[in-house]
Amino acid sequence: MPDPGTTARLLGITVLGDFILNEGIDPILDNLTGRAGATAVALNPTVTAPSEQGVGSFQPPIDAGSSPRLFERPLWGERALWVRGGPSYRANEDFYADTPYVPRRPNDLTDAHGALIGDFIDAALDRGLKVYFQVGAVQPSGLRDADRPRLPDGNLPQDRMADTGSLASAAIRAYNRAYVRDLLEHYPRITGFRPDWPEYPCYKLDEAFQDFGPQVQTWAENRGFDFNAIQQEMTAFYTYLHGSLQNRDLEDFAGADRGKLSQISLLRRYPAALEWLRLKASLSVDLLQHWRDSITQFGGPEKELSANAFMPPLTLFTGFDFAGAAAHCQAISPKFYTMHWSAMVEFWGRVLLERNPGLDEKLLVRSLAHLFDLGDDIAATGLDAYGYPEPDEPHPIPNAPQERKIAQVLALAQGRARITPLVHGYGPLDDFTRRFRLVARSPVDGVWINRYGYLSDTKLDAIGDIWRS
Protein backbone atom coordinates (compact mmCIF):
# COMPACT_ATOMS: atom_id res chain seq x y z
CA MET A 1 0.00 0.00 0.00
CA PRO A 2 1.45 3.43 -0.91
CA ASP A 3 2.15 5.91 1.85
CA PRO A 4 -0.71 8.42 1.75
CA GLY A 5 1.86 11.06 2.65
CA THR A 6 1.69 14.31 4.56
CA THR A 7 -1.26 15.23 6.71
CA ALA A 8 -1.20 18.87 5.48
CA ARG A 9 -4.45 19.67 3.69
CA LEU A 10 -4.16 20.15 -0.04
CA LEU A 11 -5.94 22.72 -2.20
CA GLY A 12 -5.48 22.00 -5.89
CA ILE A 13 -6.79 23.67 -9.04
CA THR A 14 -6.77 22.25 -12.56
CA VAL A 15 -5.30 24.65 -15.13
CA LEU A 16 -5.19 23.56 -18.76
CA GLY A 17 -2.61 24.82 -21.22
CA ASP A 18 -5.11 27.09 -22.99
CA PHE A 19 -5.18 29.46 -20.03
CA ILE A 20 -1.42 29.36 -19.47
CA LEU A 21 -1.04 30.54 -23.07
CA ASN A 22 -3.63 33.27 -22.60
CA GLU A 23 -2.76 34.66 -19.17
CA GLY A 24 0.89 33.75 -18.72
CA ILE A 25 2.73 31.66 -16.15
CA ASP A 26 3.29 34.20 -13.38
CA PRO A 27 -0.18 35.81 -13.45
CA ILE A 28 -1.82 32.39 -13.15
CA LEU A 29 0.49 31.28 -10.35
CA ASP A 30 -0.14 34.59 -8.58
CA ASN A 31 -3.88 33.92 -8.78
CA LEU A 32 -3.51 30.33 -7.57
CA THR A 33 -1.26 31.06 -4.62
CA GLY A 34 -2.13 34.66 -3.77
CA ARG A 35 -5.87 34.81 -4.33
CA ALA A 36 -6.93 31.19 -3.79
CA GLY A 37 -4.21 29.85 -1.51
CA ALA A 38 -3.66 26.75 -3.65
CA THR A 39 -0.95 24.25 -2.79
CA ALA A 40 -1.22 22.09 -5.92
CA VAL A 41 -1.99 22.38 -9.61
CA ALA A 42 -2.90 19.86 -12.30
CA LEU A 43 -2.46 20.36 -16.03
CA ASN A 44 -2.30 18.40 -19.26
CA PRO A 45 0.63 18.10 -21.69
CA THR A 46 -1.20 19.96 -24.47
CA VAL A 47 -1.00 23.38 -26.10
CA THR A 48 -3.81 24.87 -28.16
CA ALA A 49 -4.89 27.67 -30.48
CA PRO A 50 -8.25 28.91 -31.75
CA SER A 51 -9.59 27.07 -34.79
CA GLU A 52 -12.43 27.30 -37.24
CA GLN A 53 -15.75 25.68 -36.46
CA GLY A 54 -15.63 21.89 -36.48
CA VAL A 55 -11.84 21.68 -36.29
CA GLY A 56 -10.41 20.25 -33.08
CA SER A 57 -12.61 20.32 -29.98
CA PHE A 58 -15.19 22.70 -28.59
CA GLN A 59 -14.40 24.29 -25.24
CA PRO A 60 -15.87 24.11 -22.68
CA PRO A 61 -16.81 20.46 -23.32
CA ILE A 62 -20.35 20.05 -24.61
CA ASP A 63 -20.98 16.78 -22.69
CA ALA A 64 -22.72 14.93 -25.52
CA GLY A 65 -24.54 18.07 -26.60
CA SER A 66 -26.18 18.66 -23.22
CA SER A 67 -23.91 21.28 -21.66
CA PRO A 68 -24.63 25.02 -21.74
CA ARG A 69 -21.35 25.77 -19.96
CA LEU A 70 -19.37 28.95 -20.60
CA PHE A 71 -15.95 29.90 -19.28
CA GLU A 72 -15.77 32.79 -16.82
CA ARG A 73 -12.20 33.55 -17.86
CA PRO A 74 -12.08 34.27 -21.60
CA LEU A 75 -9.88 32.34 -24.00
CA TRP A 76 -8.67 34.46 -26.89
CA GLY A 77 -11.49 36.85 -26.01
CA GLU A 78 -14.23 34.19 -26.08
CA ARG A 79 -16.18 32.32 -23.39
CA ALA A 80 -16.70 29.32 -25.71
CA LEU A 81 -14.84 28.42 -28.89
CA TRP A 82 -13.28 25.74 -31.08
CA VAL A 83 -9.61 25.00 -30.41
CA ARG A 84 -7.05 22.75 -32.03
CA GLY A 85 -4.26 21.21 -30.02
CA GLY A 86 -0.87 19.62 -30.11
CA PRO A 87 1.35 17.81 -27.64
CA SER A 88 3.68 19.94 -25.58
CA TYR A 89 6.58 17.54 -26.21
CA ARG A 90 8.00 15.24 -28.87
CA ALA A 91 7.18 11.66 -27.95
CA ASN A 92 9.70 8.83 -28.05
CA GLU A 93 7.90 6.53 -30.48
CA ASP A 94 10.14 3.60 -29.56
CA PHE A 95 8.34 3.42 -26.22
CA TYR A 96 5.08 2.53 -28.02
CA ALA A 97 6.36 -0.53 -29.89
CA ASP A 98 4.13 -2.90 -27.87
CA THR A 99 0.82 -1.14 -28.61
CA PRO A 100 -1.14 -0.34 -31.78
CA TYR A 101 -1.66 3.16 -30.38
CA VAL A 102 0.81 5.81 -31.43
CA PRO A 103 1.52 9.01 -29.53
CA ARG A 104 0.15 12.32 -30.74
CA ARG A 105 2.25 13.85 -33.50
CA PRO A 106 3.98 17.15 -32.79
CA ASN A 107 2.80 20.07 -34.89
CA ASP A 108 3.26 23.80 -35.29
CA LEU A 109 1.78 24.39 -31.83
CA THR A 110 4.36 22.06 -30.30
CA ASP A 111 7.13 24.08 -31.95
CA ALA A 112 5.63 27.45 -31.04
CA HIS A 113 4.35 26.87 -27.52
CA GLY A 114 5.30 23.40 -26.26
CA ALA A 115 8.07 24.63 -23.97
CA LEU A 116 5.51 26.63 -22.00
CA ILE A 117 4.22 23.52 -20.20
CA GLY A 118 7.64 22.58 -18.87
CA ASP A 119 8.29 26.19 -17.88
CA PHE A 120 4.98 26.29 -15.99
CA ILE A 121 5.78 23.04 -14.18
CA ASP A 122 9.18 24.33 -13.09
CA ALA A 123 7.77 27.69 -11.98
CA ALA A 124 4.97 26.05 -9.99
CA LEU A 125 7.34 23.63 -8.27
CA ASP A 126 9.71 26.49 -7.47
CA ARG A 127 6.82 28.23 -5.69
CA GLY A 128 6.25 25.14 -3.55
CA LEU A 129 3.21 23.77 -5.38
CA LYS A 130 2.70 20.12 -6.11
CA VAL A 131 2.25 19.55 -9.85
CA TYR A 132 0.29 16.70 -11.43
CA PHE A 133 -0.64 15.63 -14.93
CA GLN A 134 -4.38 15.06 -15.32
CA VAL A 135 -4.82 12.44 -18.05
CA GLY A 136 -7.38 9.89 -19.18
CA ALA A 137 -7.10 6.52 -17.44
CA VAL A 138 -8.15 4.60 -20.58
CA GLN A 139 -8.24 7.21 -23.36
CA PRO A 140 -5.44 6.79 -25.89
CA SER A 141 -5.49 9.06 -28.90
CA GLY A 142 -7.45 7.46 -31.75
CA LEU A 143 -9.41 4.98 -29.60
CA ARG A 144 -10.42 1.96 -31.71
CA ASP A 145 -13.82 0.28 -31.63
CA ALA A 146 -11.98 -2.94 -30.78
CA ASP A 147 -11.03 -1.36 -27.45
CA ARG A 148 -14.34 0.31 -26.67
CA PRO A 149 -16.64 -1.24 -24.04
CA ARG A 150 -19.58 -3.39 -25.14
CA LEU A 151 -23.15 -3.84 -23.97
CA PRO A 152 -24.41 -7.25 -22.78
CA ASP A 153 -25.52 -8.08 -26.34
CA GLY A 154 -22.05 -7.31 -27.69
CA ASN A 155 -22.97 -4.02 -29.36
CA LEU A 156 -21.32 -0.67 -28.73
CA PRO A 157 -23.24 1.69 -26.41
CA GLN A 158 -24.84 4.58 -28.26
CA ASP A 159 -24.55 8.28 -27.44
CA ARG A 160 -21.90 7.91 -24.75
CA MET A 161 -20.87 11.04 -22.89
CA ALA A 162 -17.40 9.71 -22.02
CA ASP A 163 -15.47 8.04 -24.84
CA THR A 164 -13.37 5.80 -22.63
CA GLY A 165 -11.87 2.42 -23.43
CA SER A 166 -12.20 -1.02 -21.96
CA LEU A 167 -10.45 -1.37 -18.62
CA ALA A 168 -9.29 -4.83 -19.72
CA SER A 169 -7.71 -3.74 -23.02
CA ALA A 170 -4.11 -4.96 -23.22
CA ALA A 171 -3.46 -2.46 -26.02
CA ILE A 172 -4.59 0.47 -23.87
CA ARG A 173 -2.58 -0.71 -20.90
CA ALA A 174 0.53 -1.00 -23.08
CA TYR A 175 -0.14 2.54 -24.30
CA ASN A 176 -0.56 3.80 -20.73
CA ARG A 177 2.76 2.30 -19.71
CA ALA A 178 4.50 3.94 -22.67
CA TYR A 179 2.72 7.25 -22.05
CA VAL A 180 3.76 7.34 -18.40
CA ARG A 181 7.34 6.58 -19.39
CA ASP A 182 7.28 9.29 -22.06
CA LEU A 183 5.89 11.96 -19.76
CA LEU A 184 8.32 11.13 -16.97
CA GLU A 185 11.23 11.30 -19.40
CA HIS A 186 10.20 14.77 -20.54
CA TYR A 187 8.91 16.08 -17.20
CA PRO A 188 10.84 14.22 -14.47
CA ARG A 189 10.04 16.81 -11.79
CA ILE A 190 6.26 16.34 -11.72
CA THR A 191 4.74 15.21 -8.45
CA GLY A 192 2.48 12.56 -9.95
CA PHE A 193 -0.49 11.62 -12.10
CA ARG A 194 -4.24 12.13 -11.78
CA PRO A 195 -5.90 9.61 -14.14
CA ASP A 196 -9.54 10.39 -14.87
CA TRP A 197 -12.22 7.68 -15.19
CA PRO A 198 -10.35 4.54 -14.04
CA GLU A 199 -13.85 3.03 -14.08
CA TYR A 200 -16.86 2.78 -16.41
CA PRO A 201 -18.64 6.18 -16.45
CA CYS A 202 -22.42 5.93 -16.12
CA TYR A 203 -23.72 9.30 -17.28
CA LYS A 204 -26.06 7.60 -19.74
CA LEU A 205 -28.09 4.45 -19.02
CA ASP A 206 -26.25 2.46 -21.70
CA GLU A 207 -22.92 3.41 -20.11
CA ALA A 208 -24.06 1.79 -16.85
CA PHE A 209 -24.16 -1.57 -18.66
CA GLN A 210 -20.51 -1.61 -19.76
CA ASP A 211 -18.44 -3.81 -20.33
CA PHE A 212 -19.11 -7.16 -21.97
CA GLY A 213 -16.40 -7.09 -24.61
CA PRO A 214 -14.18 -10.08 -25.41
CA GLN A 215 -11.24 -8.61 -23.50
CA VAL A 216 -13.30 -8.41 -20.33
CA GLN A 217 -14.53 -11.96 -20.91
CA THR A 218 -10.96 -13.25 -21.05
CA TRP A 219 -9.91 -11.20 -18.03
CA ALA A 220 -12.94 -12.35 -16.02
CA GLU A 221 -12.71 -16.03 -16.85
CA ASN A 222 -9.00 -16.06 -16.00
CA ARG A 223 -9.98 -14.87 -12.52
CA GLY A 224 -12.80 -17.30 -11.86
CA PHE A 225 -15.84 -15.21 -12.82
CA ASP A 226 -18.69 -16.99 -14.61
CA PHE A 227 -18.81 -14.47 -17.43
CA ASN A 228 -21.49 -16.26 -19.45
CA ALA A 229 -23.89 -16.36 -16.50
CA ILE A 230 -23.27 -12.68 -15.78
CA GLN A 231 -23.78 -11.74 -19.41
CA GLN A 232 -26.98 -13.76 -19.69
CA GLU A 233 -28.59 -12.19 -16.63
CA MET A 234 -27.48 -8.65 -17.44
CA THR A 235 -28.88 -9.05 -20.94
CA ALA A 236 -32.21 -9.97 -19.34
CA PHE A 237 -31.99 -7.02 -16.93
CA TYR A 238 -31.13 -4.59 -19.75
CA THR A 239 -34.10 -5.90 -21.74
CA TYR A 240 -36.37 -5.52 -18.70
CA LEU A 241 -35.39 -1.87 -18.29
CA HIS A 242 -35.89 -1.20 -21.99
CA GLY A 243 -39.49 -2.31 -22.40
CA SER A 244 -40.88 -4.10 -19.35
CA LEU A 245 -40.50 -1.52 -16.56
CA GLN A 246 -43.84 -0.65 -14.95
CA ASN A 247 -45.09 1.91 -12.44
CA ARG A 248 -45.43 -0.69 -9.70
CA ASP A 249 -41.68 -1.34 -10.07
CA LEU A 250 -41.02 2.30 -9.19
CA GLU A 251 -43.37 2.81 -6.26
CA ASP A 252 -40.92 1.55 -3.64
CA PHE A 253 -38.03 3.56 -5.17
CA ALA A 254 -40.14 6.72 -5.19
CA GLY A 255 -41.37 6.23 -1.63
CA ALA A 256 -39.91 6.86 1.79
CA ASP A 257 -37.97 3.58 1.77
CA ARG A 258 -36.06 4.74 -1.36
CA GLY A 259 -36.17 1.30 -2.93
CA LYS A 260 -34.22 -0.59 -0.28
CA LEU A 261 -36.48 -3.62 -0.47
CA SER A 262 -36.77 -3.43 -4.24
CA GLN A 263 -33.01 -3.40 -4.71
CA ILE A 264 -32.69 -6.58 -2.66
CA SER A 265 -35.55 -8.11 -4.63
CA LEU A 266 -33.83 -7.26 -7.90
CA LEU A 267 -30.63 -8.93 -6.71
CA ARG A 268 -32.64 -12.05 -5.89
CA ARG A 269 -34.22 -11.91 -9.34
CA TYR A 270 -30.87 -11.28 -11.05
CA PRO A 271 -28.30 -12.81 -8.67
CA ALA A 272 -25.47 -12.57 -11.18
CA ALA A 273 -25.81 -8.78 -11.02
CA LEU A 274 -23.86 -8.78 -7.78
CA GLU A 275 -21.06 -10.74 -9.47
CA TRP A 276 -21.16 -8.20 -12.29
CA LEU A 277 -20.64 -5.34 -9.84
CA ARG A 278 -17.81 -7.27 -8.20
CA LEU A 279 -16.25 -7.94 -11.60
CA LYS A 280 -16.22 -4.25 -12.51
CA ALA A 281 -14.74 -3.32 -9.14
CA SER A 282 -11.99 -5.92 -9.50
CA LEU A 283 -11.21 -4.68 -12.99
CA SER A 284 -10.98 -1.05 -11.86
CA VAL A 285 -8.59 -1.94 -9.04
CA ASP A 286 -6.49 -4.02 -11.44
CA LEU A 287 -6.22 -1.07 -13.84
CA LEU A 288 -5.07 1.21 -11.02
CA GLN A 289 -2.47 -1.35 -10.00
CA HIS A 290 -1.19 -1.22 -13.60
CA TRP A 291 -0.98 2.57 -13.38
CA ARG A 292 0.86 2.32 -10.07
CA ASP A 293 3.31 -0.28 -11.41
CA SER A 294 4.04 1.83 -14.49
CA ILE A 295 4.62 4.99 -12.48
CA THR A 296 6.88 3.17 -10.03
CA GLN A 297 8.85 1.49 -12.83
CA PHE A 298 9.69 4.73 -14.63
CA GLY A 299 9.47 7.34 -11.89
CA GLY A 300 9.95 5.55 -8.60
CA PRO A 301 7.56 4.93 -5.69
CA GLU A 302 7.70 8.58 -4.64
CA LYS A 303 5.71 9.69 -7.69
CA GLU A 304 2.09 9.97 -6.62
CA LEU A 305 -1.02 8.32 -8.07
CA SER A 306 -4.19 10.30 -7.36
CA ALA A 307 -7.30 8.92 -9.06
CA ASN A 308 -10.43 10.86 -10.04
CA ALA A 309 -13.69 8.94 -9.65
CA PHE A 310 -17.47 9.12 -9.43
CA MET A 311 -19.23 9.40 -6.07
CA PRO A 312 -21.28 6.78 -4.20
CA PRO A 313 -23.71 5.32 -4.92
CA LEU A 314 -22.82 5.79 -8.60
CA THR A 315 -19.54 3.96 -8.05
CA LEU A 316 -21.58 0.77 -7.70
CA PHE A 317 -22.33 1.16 -11.41
CA THR A 318 -18.92 2.49 -12.51
CA GLY A 319 -16.94 -0.15 -10.63
CA PHE A 320 -14.70 2.21 -8.68
CA ASP A 321 -13.78 0.59 -5.36
CA PHE A 322 -12.45 3.09 -2.81
CA ALA A 323 -11.01 0.45 -0.48
CA GLY A 324 -9.37 -1.45 -3.33
CA ALA A 325 -8.07 1.71 -5.01
CA ALA A 326 -6.51 2.86 -1.75
CA ALA A 327 -4.07 -0.04 -1.98
CA HIS A 328 -2.47 1.64 -5.01
CA CYS A 329 -3.28 5.38 -4.74
CA GLN A 330 -1.87 8.00 -2.42
CA ALA A 331 -5.06 9.98 -2.94
CA ILE A 332 -8.54 9.65 -4.42
CA SER A 333 -10.68 12.53 -5.69
CA PRO A 334 -14.39 11.69 -5.82
CA LYS A 335 -16.10 14.16 -8.12
CA PHE A 336 -18.61 16.64 -6.75
CA TYR A 337 -19.80 17.45 -10.27
CA THR A 338 -23.30 18.28 -9.14
CA MET A 339 -24.37 19.51 -12.57
CA HIS A 340 -23.73 15.98 -13.86
CA TRP A 341 -25.70 14.36 -11.04
CA SER A 342 -28.65 16.50 -12.03
CA ALA A 343 -28.21 15.87 -15.76
CA MET A 344 -28.08 12.12 -15.22
CA VAL A 345 -31.65 12.10 -13.90
CA GLU A 346 -32.79 13.51 -17.22
CA PHE A 347 -30.40 11.34 -19.29
CA TRP A 348 -31.60 8.08 -17.71
CA GLY A 349 -35.20 9.26 -17.35
CA ARG A 350 -35.75 10.19 -21.00
CA VAL A 351 -34.57 6.77 -22.16
CA LEU A 352 -36.73 4.93 -19.64
CA LEU A 353 -39.81 6.98 -20.54
CA GLU A 354 -39.27 6.41 -24.24
CA ARG A 355 -38.69 2.68 -23.92
CA ASN A 356 -41.45 2.04 -21.37
CA PRO A 357 -44.69 3.71 -22.52
CA GLY A 358 -47.09 4.45 -19.68
CA LEU A 359 -44.49 5.16 -17.00
CA ASP A 360 -45.53 7.89 -14.59
CA GLU A 361 -42.94 10.67 -14.92
CA LYS A 362 -43.39 11.78 -11.31
CA LEU A 363 -42.69 8.27 -10.03
CA LEU A 364 -39.72 7.97 -12.37
CA VAL A 365 -38.01 11.24 -11.48
CA ARG A 366 -38.36 10.57 -7.74
CA SER A 367 -37.10 7.02 -8.19
CA LEU A 368 -33.98 8.18 -10.03
CA ALA A 369 -33.30 11.01 -7.57
CA HIS A 370 -33.52 8.50 -4.73
CA LEU A 371 -31.40 5.93 -6.58
CA PHE A 372 -28.66 8.55 -7.06
CA ASP A 373 -29.22 9.95 -3.53
CA LEU A 374 -29.80 13.55 -4.58
CA GLY A 375 -31.85 14.71 -1.61
CA ASP A 376 -33.84 13.82 1.47
CA ASP A 377 -37.15 15.30 0.34
CA ILE A 378 -37.59 14.90 -3.41
CA ALA A 379 -40.56 17.02 -4.48
CA ALA A 380 -39.92 16.94 -8.24
CA THR A 381 -42.90 16.07 -10.42
CA GLY A 382 -41.07 15.87 -13.76
CA LEU A 383 -37.64 15.37 -15.28
CA ASP A 384 -37.39 19.08 -16.05
CA ALA A 385 -36.74 19.64 -12.33
CA TYR A 386 -33.24 18.34 -13.04
CA GLY A 387 -31.24 18.44 -16.28
CA TYR A 388 -28.07 20.44 -16.96
CA PRO A 389 -28.03 23.76 -15.05
CA GLU A 390 -27.47 26.97 -17.01
CA PRO A 391 -24.35 29.04 -16.14
CA ASP A 392 -26.36 31.31 -13.81
CA GLU A 393 -28.54 28.54 -12.35
CA PRO A 394 -27.82 26.95 -8.94
CA HIS A 395 -27.25 23.20 -8.99
CA PRO A 396 -30.34 21.43 -7.57
CA ILE A 397 -28.42 19.27 -5.08
CA PRO A 398 -28.82 20.28 -1.41
CA ASN A 399 -26.09 20.00 1.20
CA ALA A 400 -27.29 16.89 3.04
CA PRO A 401 -26.65 14.30 0.29
CA GLN A 402 -23.26 15.85 -0.43
CA GLU A 403 -22.30 15.59 3.23
CA ARG A 404 -23.58 12.01 3.25
CA LYS A 405 -21.44 11.11 0.25
CA ILE A 406 -18.33 12.51 1.93
CA ALA A 407 -18.98 10.35 5.00
CA GLN A 408 -19.52 7.31 2.79
CA VAL A 409 -16.25 7.81 0.91
CA LEU A 410 -14.27 8.30 4.12
CA ALA A 411 -15.76 5.12 5.53
CA LEU A 412 -15.00 3.15 2.37
CA ALA A 413 -11.39 4.36 2.07
CA GLN A 414 -10.70 3.48 5.73
CA GLY A 415 -7.92 6.06 6.02
CA ARG A 416 -5.66 4.19 3.61
CA ALA A 417 -5.57 7.01 1.04
CA ARG A 418 -6.03 10.77 1.23
CA ILE A 419 -9.54 11.81 0.18
CA THR A 420 -9.42 15.06 -1.79
CA PRO A 421 -12.84 15.63 -3.42
CA LEU A 422 -12.98 17.36 -6.80
CA VAL A 423 -15.43 20.28 -6.82
CA HIS A 424 -16.49 21.79 -10.14
CA GLY A 425 -16.11 25.54 -10.59
CA TYR A 426 -19.08 25.79 -12.97
CA GLY A 427 -22.08 27.72 -11.70
CA PRO A 428 -23.02 31.06 -10.13
CA LEU A 429 -20.83 32.47 -7.37
CA ASP A 430 -23.16 31.84 -4.42
CA ASP A 431 -23.86 28.26 -5.43
CA PHE A 432 -20.19 27.50 -6.12
CA THR A 433 -19.12 28.91 -2.75
CA ARG A 434 -21.86 26.87 -1.04
CA ARG A 435 -20.55 23.68 -2.62
CA PHE A 436 -16.88 24.50 -2.07
CA ARG A 437 -17.40 25.58 1.56
CA LEU A 438 -19.24 22.34 2.31
CA VAL A 439 -16.29 20.23 1.15
CA ALA A 440 -13.58 22.53 2.51
CA ARG A 441 -15.07 22.41 6.01
CA SER A 442 -15.63 18.66 5.99
CA PRO A 443 -13.13 16.17 7.49
CA VAL A 444 -11.49 15.37 4.12
CA ASP A 445 -7.76 15.65 3.42
CA GLY A 446 -8.04 18.43 0.87
CA VAL A 447 -9.98 19.73 -2.11
CA TRP A 448 -9.41 19.96 -5.85
CA ILE A 449 -11.28 22.39 -8.10
CA ASN A 450 -11.92 21.78 -11.78
CA ARG A 451 -11.08 24.06 -13.47
CA TYR A 452 -9.41 27.46 -13.64
CA GLY A 453 -11.47 28.61 -16.62
CA TYR A 454 -14.65 28.67 -14.52
CA LEU A 455 -13.04 30.67 -11.71
CA SER A 456 -13.46 34.43 -12.00
CA ASP A 457 -11.27 36.65 -9.85
CA THR A 458 -14.24 36.97 -7.49
CA LYS A 459 -14.46 33.19 -7.17
CA LEU A 460 -10.71 32.91 -6.62
CA ASP A 461 -10.94 35.47 -3.81
CA ALA A 462 -13.88 33.58 -2.29
CA ILE A 463 -11.90 30.33 -2.41
CA GLY A 464 -9.04 32.00 -0.55
CA ASP A 465 -11.33 33.49 2.08
CA ILE A 466 -13.03 30.14 2.75
CA TRP A 467 -9.83 28.09 2.70
CA ARG A 468 -7.92 30.39 5.03
CA SER A 469 -10.78 30.87 7.50
PLM regions with names:
Residues S141-R150, P201-L205, P301-M344, G427-V444, ...:
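Substrate-binding cleft/loops of secretory-pathway carbohydrate-active enzymes
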Residues G259-L274, E302-F310, V365-F432:
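Active-site clefts of carbohydrate-active enzymes
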Residues D196, I230-A273, F320-P391, V444-T458:
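Aromatic- and acid-rich polysaccharide-binding/catalytic face
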Residues S51-P87, Q139-A162, D196-Q263, A326, ...:
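Aromatic- and acidic-residue-enriched segments that line the glycan-binding/catalytic groove
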Residues F19-G34, I172-L184, P313-A325, L429-A440:
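Short, acidic/polar
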